[in-house]
Amino acid sequence: MHVKKGDTVIVNAGKDKGKKGRVLAAYPKKERVLVEGINLVKKHSRPSQANPQGGIVTQEAAIHVSNVSLIDPKSGKATRIGYKVLDNGKKVRYAKKSGEVLDK
């Protein structure tokens, strides 16, 4: 999967197209990501110890990974991802537009 937790992404398709957000969680087996402030849904929750009031809660729902693109740290625009092996043998992701290494 080309995105990881903590990456900043832009949404390519759907009702939140064009919005930017940070990846909160990645689910590789389901090919989905949870993005901060994107795909908000209302859930009905029962009163519990954590939420004694209960009621309707707004939260993020996961979207398919193909509907997001990583944002290039240099230009701030959407970019594709490539992989390369550094001299020390570490495999890292890099932005195709700028060549900037994304993994530390």
Swiss-Prot record:
Residues annotated as signal peptide: none
GO terms classed as biological process: translation
Keywords, alphabetical: Ribonucleoprotein, Ribosomal protein, RNA-binding, rRNA-binding
CDD domains with a match to the protein in the record: KOW_RPL26
One GO MF term attached to the UniProt entry: structural constituent of ribosome
Pfam family, one: KOW
Record-level GO cellular component terms: ribonucleoprotein complex; ribosome
Annotated SUPFAM superfamilies: Translation proteins SH3-like domain
Family classification: Belongs to the universal ribosomal protein uL24 family.
Function: One of two assembly initiator proteins, it binds directly to the 5'-end of the 23S rRNA, where it nucleates assembly of the 50S subunit. One of the proteins that surrounds the polypeptide exit tunnel on the outside of the subunit.
Subunit structure, as described in the record: Part of the 50S ribosomal subunit.
PANTHER family attached to this UniProt entry: MITOCHONDRIAL RIBOSOMAL PROTEIN L24
NCBIfam families: rplX_bact
Annotated protein name in UniProt: Large ribosomal subunit protein uL24
